[in-house]
Every structure is written in C-alpha cells, then in structure tokens.
Amino acid sequence: MEASSVLPCKWCTHLQGLLLTASFLTCCHLPTTAQITIELEPPQVIEGENVLIRVNNLTENLITLAWFRGMRIKSPQIGQYTPATKVTVLGPGHSGRETLYSNGSLQIYNVTQEDIGFYSLRIINKHAEIVSITSIYLNVYSSLWTCEHPSPHAKLTIESVPPGISEGGSVLLLVKNLPQNLLSLFWYKGVIAVKKFEIARHIKATNSSVPGPAHTGRETVFSNGSLLLQEVMQSDTGFYTLRTMSTDLKDEVAHVQLYMDTYLLTCYHPLQVKIESLPQNVAVGKTVLLLVHNLPEDFQAFFWYKSAYRRDTYKIAEYKRAMDATILGSAYSSREFIYNNGSMLIIDVTEDDAGYFLLEILREDLKIEKAYIQLHVNSFVSNSKDSASTARLSIESVPPSIVEGGSVLLLVHNLPKNLQSLFWYKGMIAEKKSELIQHIIATSSSLPGPAHSGRETVYNNGSLLLQRVMQNDTQFYTLQTMDTDLKYEVAHVQLQLDTSLSTWYHPLQVKIESLPRNVAVGKSVLFLVHNFPEVFRAFSWYKPAYKSHTSKIVEYHRFTDSATVGAAYRGIEVIFTNGSMVMIDVTEDDAGFYMLEILREDFKVEKAYVQLHVNSFVPNSKVSVSTARLSIESVPPSIVGGESVLLLVHNLPKNLQSLFWYKGVIAEEKSELIQHIIATSSSLPGPAHSGRETVYSNGSLLLQRVMQNDTGFYTLLTMSTDLKDEIAHVQLQLDTSTCCSLLTSDQLIIVPVPRNIAVGKSVLLLVCNVPKDVQTIFWYKSVYRTDIFKIAEYSRSMESTIWGLAHSGKEMVYTNGSLLIQNVTEHDAGLYMLEILHKDYKLERAHVQVHVNNPVSWPFVRVTDTTVRVQSSVVFTCFSADPGVSIRWLFNKQSLQLTERMTLSPSKCQLSIDPVWREDAGKYQCEVSNPVSSKSSLPVRLAVIEE
C-alpha cells in the first residue's frame, strides 16, 4: 500500500473506524514549506513482526522531532530526538520496544494488538513552536494464522476428502492442527471415545499403529493422524472421532461426519441467489412480489432490469448499500418498489410486465452474481362493464404453505358490501358439525362452532387466523357469506403444510396435484394423485365435490379392472389405474372443485379434493392454433441429483429448419449446448455440452445424471425456413425435499440443513426415519444425557414442549422431531444429541454436528519484490486472519493457471515463480474462502524488466 496524501486533520478521527486492514493516514495540522510524509514498512503488520514508520522530506532547520502515541495534545510521548545534540529522550509512552532514528523514523519491535492506533510526529522549531504534526494509523493483524505457521492455539479439525463418497470408493479423513507435542492418537467409530468403538491407535514415538475392536481391515492411519477408509460401504456413514494425547497428558477431541455423495449432491449445495414470484401467476391490475432468497451479506449494490440483458435502457432501479439509496433507471414505471433485501414489488401489473427480469448483485470483492425470474401475467376477462361489482369471493392462504407449529391467515378478498354474517367450515361441505366459527357483522361478535379447536380467530374483514397448525389441519376450508338480501356465496381454500419440514413424518395422505395449476380454455389438465394406496377396491371421481349420482364422473373397480361412467361424465375425461385423471379440451364450465373417493381394502373410505382454475383464452386471430407459442415443460418439474430430466418442447413451428439449446437465459455461442438440423436429423454439440445432453427430433432435451450446477434456466432458439426466430425458456430445479428419502437405511439420522452455517443465520436439524411409536423426544447440546445440556423435551401425546436448561430462546422443536436454531452464534457449534423414547420405553439416539463459520476477513498479499528481472525469482505470500481457509490465486482478475515454473506451498498461501518470464508481469491477488464466504486481497502489481 502506498502512502496516502496529506489530509485535513478533521478527517483523521472519522476515518479511524473505517480502517479494517493494516493501513495508515497522514495528517498535517500546520503549513510547512516541505511536505512531510510518513509510511509503514511493511504496509501490513502481523503480531510479532517489526514495523518501521519511515519519515520522508524532513527539513534541515528543525530543532526537535517528537513521537507521540495518539493524536491529542496530551497524548503520551514515546520519545524525542534533537539533531543538533544527537540526544534521544524517552517519554512515558515508551514501552521498551521503540527506537528513534536520526532521520526521524520510528521502529517498533515485536508488535502486539495493543500497538494498534494513531502515531503522531511533531516537528518543533528553535522558537519551541510546533511547525507540523503528521499522523499515521497502525493496525496489527492477529497471529491466529499466518502462512505455513499455524498458531499453537489452532483447534484440532478433520476434513473429509472428498466431502461425500460413492459406495466402494475411498475417503481420507484429513487431520489439521495436530498438537506439536503429540504423544499418541486414537480413532473411534461414532461420537463417543470408548474402547469397543476404537478403530486404531497410533504411537508417535515408534511411528506404529495398533488396530482396535472396531477395525475392519479397511482402515489405515498415517503419521499425520489422518485416517484412510477404503471400499466404503453404506454402514460406514456416520460420525468418526479422533482423540489426541500430548506429552503433558492433555486430551483433545474432534469429530467428522461421513456422507454418501448422492446425498450431498441434493441436500448440500451452495446457497444460490434465487427469485420467487408471489404469486406465481399474477392477474392484470394485481400486485406481485419478486422475493429474493439468499442475497449475499457482502453486497455493495444490486440492479433490477426488465430484461435478461444488462442494458441501461432496461434498468428499473439501482440500490447502493453504503448510501442506502435507490437510483431509478430508464425502465422504471413508478409502479416498482425496491427493498434493501433485494426484493421488488410491482403494483397494478399490466400485460407489458410479463417476461424476464434480471437481478444483478455487485459483491464486496467486485464479483457479479445474477439471478433471473420470469413473470407470468394473466389477462382478466370481465363479463360486465363494472368488473369491481362482480368480483368473486375468494380466499388466499398467507403464506401459501405453512410449517407445522406455525400460523396461517386465510385472507378473504371481495366480501359482499351488504354483508350480514359469515361462517367458516372445516372441509368442503358447509354443515353444522364442521362449523368452526360464525361472525355477525352488526354486533362485530363471533361464536365458536362444533369444530372450533380454540386456535381459530376470525377478523372483521372475514379472514381466519389459524395458530399452531397441526398435520390434521391440512385440508380444505369453506367460507359461506350471507348478505342482507339473504343471498349466499361460498368460497374454498386449501391449507397445505410445507413438506420441506414437517410433513415427512406423518402418514402419507392422498393428495391431488393439478398439472398445470392454471389451465387455459382448450388445453388439457392432469389431476395427478400422490400417495395412492397400493391396496384398494375402487375409486370414484365427482364434479362438484359432493357424493351424489348426478355429480359422479366415473367409478373404477380394481377387481374387474373396469370403469363405469356417471352422470357428470362429459367424454373429455380419461382415468388411470393409479387414480389420476386427465381432462382434454377444458372449458370454463370445468372450473371448480373435484373429489376423489377411494374405497380401501378394509372398506374404509378416503377422500381427496382438488380445485381446477381455468383461464379464458383470448386469441388474437381467428385461427388460434397457428399462434400457439413455443413453450418448454420440465418433466418432472423438479429433479433429484443424479437422475434424469426431460425438457419437453411444445408447439414447435411447422416449417422448422434448425434449433439450438443454451445453458442460461442468453442465446450466445459460449453457452450453446447443442444444435439440431431438421433436414439431416443430425445434432452438433456446442461449447457448453457436457456429454450428458441428448436432443430429440421433436426438439426436447434429455439431461442425464443431473448435478447441482445444472440448475438454472435453459433457452431454446428455433429457426424456421423463412428465417424467423422464436425463443422459449425453462428453469430446472433440484428437489431438496427428498433429503431423507435418499438415505438407503431406515436408521434414525439427523441432517443439518444447511451443512455449514454462517453466524447470524438459521439451521434446521432435520430428523429422518422417526419411528411411529414415539412417546417423547429429547434434544441435548451434548453427546451426554444430562439435565444441564437439555434443550427441550417434547411429548407427542400431550403435544407440548418443556424447555430445558440449555434452551437459549432461539430453538424451536417440530412435531417431527426436527430442531430449528435461529440467529446462530459460534457457541452453537458442536455436537447435538436426539433421544427418542418409544412407547415400549426403549431409547434410541442419534447425533449431529453443527458447523458454524464467521465470514472471512480481507486477506493481503506480500511480495519479495514488486520489480524483478527476467530469469530471477519472486515469492508472493497470502496472509489471512482466519483459520482453516481455502486459498486461490488470481492473475489479472482470472484464476491463475499454474505452469511448471510456479510452485505452491502445502496450504497454497505461498506462490513461488522461478524463473520469472516477461508474461508473468501483471496483478496478483489471493482469494480466501470458507464454506460460507470468500474475499479477495487488493492486487499487487509485479513488473518484469530485462537483464
């Protein structure tokens, strides 16, 4: 870092709090004929090093120069030097580690954290007047970690290499920061270090290993403490414990968890910035929220564009974090509202708002991250001139799906103006036994009904609040209104639990999914049945959702494998033996509720409901078929890592000449996956082709063995014989709701989601394979069952939670046994134990380790010389205050491509180039990262000159 220019003194104290790395300021209080400057050598200082505060441009006629610790008049003096007499006088601020030189420079030896602060040089003339005051700020890096010299206080850790392993492969449990005075070490299978679980022990003095009772013959211990496990099997997954003993008989313990890689692929991908459209389909005139998930904490600014391209003409707004200010762009329509979490609200949506939006994020390290969202806008077709007066009663679930134990608001829209009373019912049928509550408008009073559980509250606007939601609350809810002229109106809403948390562990209920969720007139819809019982006698479909002869569509008998159509059958329905039903050429009359009734083998009846939403199709020409737009469907909608997905193309142009598939939303050559020529029925792979993509003659793209980096948008570009282009997009998503289902054993296991947590974030300790006969669940912040470590105790029969001594107020227990920890701190890291008490009073235990990381701080780079000759050598060193970071070197802002002349130290913190060539000239940086963040150093420029 070069010396800064002279600044007015009033800025010195303001800038002090902004100096985050070893840095300095100079500040001249008084005018002087020669500008005195001071600089640090080296610019960045680490604990234990020496630093020289060099003085430049000293005048010859000075009488005395004095160094002070601070910037105030009464700051303690370190010492003063008089050139005429060559006498140095030490002051009260001298610590015994400072030396004053005749050129005015100050040397500080063996710097510590206590040396951080301002240092001031005062020049005094023969009249005992202060001619100038020059100040500099010294910051000292912690010595917790320096290049290739780990701190003696560094904690023992273990890393799984690779993080996940395929069955039959090998994995190295790599040990870091072994104690220097190591006597012996022991490896155990599990979290408790007891003899019966001992895999092997290693004696340092003799460099020998002895197998233990849990040794399978596939484990090898190395002299650095690491454990190699070969021919890995499913039963090898779980925790491993390392215990070390030093020569002073001190013990240290570390744990690591071994996962199968197919599991990690789906459940532990890095958090990407994603945008969610709420609602997914918005009507003209309504409001939509483009909700941003996983916005990075270290962003400088973000930009919204009404396009998939970054152009000023498409810019809606720019938000600058430092100023907390929003700058509006050319595409701003005055209907957009920007939030500092990156989200954008659009009100009074029009058809012109449909299409792609781009969110661009500028991070602290000047890296750019992009995310895209497609907004779907549906035209509202009114049957009258006064659409407001004919607005239908409707209900919205806020949020759309709810975590068990949370609250949900069933928000009512378009209540009649002359409302007299309203009634809420649980289920599809408005009958007295299922009445939750009734509300009288005139008296603003509510009366609970037979189905009221004490958790329901109705508001004056008709909305219903349901608190502490349970599994049996999930179903349809019915609202019936009565106005003053005694007219009735009915609306329904379906309450759904968030299946990413709580619904995995309850008996699987039959559910029906509408594909698509909103269907246009003339299109087809599939009512896809989930969790259909394997053993059943018959099933029947009804429209509307009441069991009567007039409403029956069809009845299927398994024994005879035959179907009997009912009075409501229209000839457009096709049923399948798994209970699902397809309807073709849908009309507006098909909208509404449908009921599936299943007669089980034990003659029990099970019912499921689905609501069909039909959108009017307004063609722009008399021949609407010819204007059908190119579209793509992901089959299935979301995919588990390692499986295959088909991007199914609809409505290809008839005069198609060729088509091109791209990875991303922009059709550019570098992102081209494959092109297909219709005339020759041949395909050519593009630069982005991975060998896993196959294109079919109907334009569809098959992607096999899907990985995390395959997620995102895909673009199809078609070219017809008249050279017209058409473009369609589709988004591929990984299904993370199958984390537990990926486990091949039925053993009780806990999964931390996410695997690595940043300080201040939340982590879910997700429990898999919870037995059905659970009586009580206990959580402990320890591997031992002790009251002082107890977080919570949950009784399933009483549906109540008793908090323990270790409860911090940040934990939440779900009925499926999972534990949510919010606002995580470093103290939350470590091992947790789940203990389950069965109804037969047997105990079952499972453990999980929580890894908590602080965001990394800024690193810096030192170089042996910034100007070197060709054929000489140079060494760059990366310094970071953070332990356990990964290091990557950058050259001219690109990842450094190592040559045979370049050597990295074991931890990659040192880069040596020998010999140096002319092409090595440029800017060098190091990037440090941990599982939750990364930062890059300021660039150091290397100049290369000829001999």
UniProtKB/Swiss-Prot annotation:
Record's subcellular location: Cell membrane; Apical cell membrane; Cell surface
MF terms in GO: identical protein binding
Membrane topology: Lipid-anchor; GPI-anchor
SUPFAM superfamilies hit by this protein: Immunoglobulin
Location of the Ig-like C2-type domain: 859-943
Oligomer and partners: Homodimer.
Name this protein carries in UniProt: Cell adhesion molecule CEACAM5
Gene name for this UniProt entry: Ceacam5
